[in-house]
C-alpha cells in the first residue's frame, strides 16, 4: 500500500515552490512564475504569496533555467464569448487587458542556438534560415556575435487552459 509524506497541494511555480508542507491549513496561496530573457539566459522568478487569517507572507526565488536562448515569446489565445460565431485571436499580455476570462490557451515559443559554429551552405538561403517566434525569417549566416553560424531550433507549443475552448 502506498504511503504519502504530504497530502497537501501539488501546485508549484517554475522553481518548484512552495515545497511539501509549506502551506498551512486554512491558508490561501497565490503562486506565480515570471519568465525573463536577459542576454541569452532564460530566467524564472517564482513567487508565492501566503495569506493566513493573521498575516501575508511573500517568498521569491529566481534562477536561470536555460542558456543559449535567442528568443522567448508568450502569446495568449483569446476566444470571444459569441456562441453563434466564436473567434480566436492571439494577443500579448498588454493586449489582453481585462479579458482574462476569454483566455483559452497560451502559445510558448522558444528559440535555442547551439554552442558550436557550423559550416553553413552558401548556395541555398532556405538551408541557412528559420522562422522566428514573431514570424520573421532569420538568416543564421547574417547574425552577429555568438549566434553567427550556429544551428537554431524553434520550439513552439500551444497549451489549452480551459476545456471549453475551440483551439
Describe the residue ranges of each PLM region.
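Extracytoplasmic beta-strand-rich oligomerization domains located immediately C-terminal to a leader/signal peptide
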Residues: 1-61, 66-67, 88, 161
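Short linear sequence signals and composition-biased patches located at protein termini or domain-edge surfaces
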Residues: 26-29, 50-167
Amino acid at each position: 500500500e502506498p504511503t504519502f509524506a504530504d497530502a497537501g497541494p501539488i501546485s508549484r511555480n517554475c522553481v518548484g515552490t512552495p515545497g511539501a508542507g509549506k502551506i498551512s491549513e486554512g491558508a490561501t496561496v497565490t503562486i506565480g512564475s515570471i519568465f525573463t530573457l536577459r542576454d541569452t539566459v532564460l530566467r524564472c522568478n517564482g513567487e508565492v504569496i501566503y495569506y493566513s487569517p493573521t498575516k501575508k507572507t511573500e517568498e521569491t526565488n529566481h534562477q536561470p533555467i536555460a542558456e543559449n536562448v535567442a528568443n522567448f515569446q508568450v502569446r495568449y489565445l483569446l476566444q470571444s464569448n459569441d456562441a453563434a460565431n466564436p473567434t480566436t485571436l492571439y494577443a500579448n499580455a498588454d493586449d489582453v487587458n481585462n479579458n482574462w476570462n476569454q483566455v483559452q490557451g497560451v502559445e510558448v515559443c522558444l528559440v535555442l542556438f547551439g554552442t558550436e559554429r557550423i559550416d553553413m551552405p552558401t548556395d541555398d538561403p532556405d538551408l541557412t534560415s528559420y522562422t522566428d517566434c514573431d514570424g520573421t525569417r532569420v538568416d543564421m549566416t547574417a547574425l552577429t556575435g555568438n549566434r553567427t553560424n550556429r544551428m537554431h531550433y524553434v520550439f513552439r507549443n500551444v497549451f489549452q487552459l480551459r476545456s471549453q475552448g475551440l483551439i
